[in-house]
């Protein structure tokens, strides 16, 4: 798992360059946004169960066939697996927020996930929608909590959505 600083330094090191003005600006932005990123992650940590529960309720309201007989979230086991996966995406999104780098999502979440879901018959569309619902909830919570900057919140969720989607969203 890398953060924005490690990634930046690695890229400059690979090309044998000193950190230039652009690198310094990126570092400055990273450190200036640190408090907001920590506050957002703390907000997610404190409300994770509620976020997952409400996001799942909204998802099943939007796509009720998921919880009907023969739906992918029908039966307690499948429903629990759905909630577990949503919690997993949320937890790793919080790690990516702190790091200001989506690399952890590629390494720990996304690598092979679409193929696994396809082989198990888990529909990707509702998964993507569930991730987006959580993003929308967290953005609303961040605005309500008066976080100074919330621009960074969408990044990990949109990254997962893009990578999981068959089509560009």
From Swiss-Prot:
KW Membrane (keyword) present: yes
Annotated residues for binding of (2R,3E)-phycocyanobilin: 82
Gene: apcF
Family as reported in the entry's similarity comment: Belongs to the phycobiliprotein family.
This protein's name: Allophycocyanin subunit beta-18
Keyword line: Antenna complex, Bile pigment, Chromophore, Electron transport, Membrane, Methylation, Photosynthesis, Phycobilisome, Thylakoid, Transport
PANTHER family found in the cross-reference section: ALLOPHYCOCYANIN BETA CHAIN (PTHR34011:SF3), PHYCOBILISOME 32.1 KDA LINKER POLYPEPTIDE, PHYCOCYANIN-ASSOCIATED, ROD 2-RELATED (PTHR34011)
Complex formation: Heterodimer of ApcE and this beta chain.
SUPFAM superfamilies in UniProt: Globin-like
Lineage: Bacteria, Bacillati, Cyanobacteriota, Cyanophyceae, Synechococcales
Gene Ontology biological process terms in this record: photosynthesis
Processing and modification events after translation: Contains one covalently linked bilin chromophore.
Species name: Synechocystis sp. (strain ATCC 27184 / PCC 6803 / Kazusa)
Membrane topology category: Peripheral membrane protein
């Amino acid at each position: 798992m890398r953060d924005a600083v490690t990634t930046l330094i690695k890229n400059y090191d690979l090309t044998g360059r000193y950190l230039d003005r652009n690198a310094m600006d990126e570092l400055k932005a990273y450190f200036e946004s640190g408090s907001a990123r920590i506050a957002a992650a703390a907000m997610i940590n404190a409300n994770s169960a509620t976020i997952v529960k409400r996001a799942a309720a909204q998802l099943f309201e939007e796509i009720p066939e998921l919880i009907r007989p023969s739906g992918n979230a029908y039966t307690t086991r499948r429903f629990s697996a759905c909630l577990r996966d949503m919690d997993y995406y949320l937890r790793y999104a919080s790690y990516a927020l702190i790091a200001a780098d989506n690399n952890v999502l590629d390494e720990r979440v996304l690598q092979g996930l679409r193929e696994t879901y396809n082989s198990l018959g888990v529909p990707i569309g509702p998964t993507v929608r569930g991730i987006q619902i959580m993003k929308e909830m967290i953005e609303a919570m961040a605005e309500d909590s008066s976080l100074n900057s919330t621009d960074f919140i969408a990044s990990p969720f949109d990254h997962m959505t893009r990578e999981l989607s068959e089509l560009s969203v």
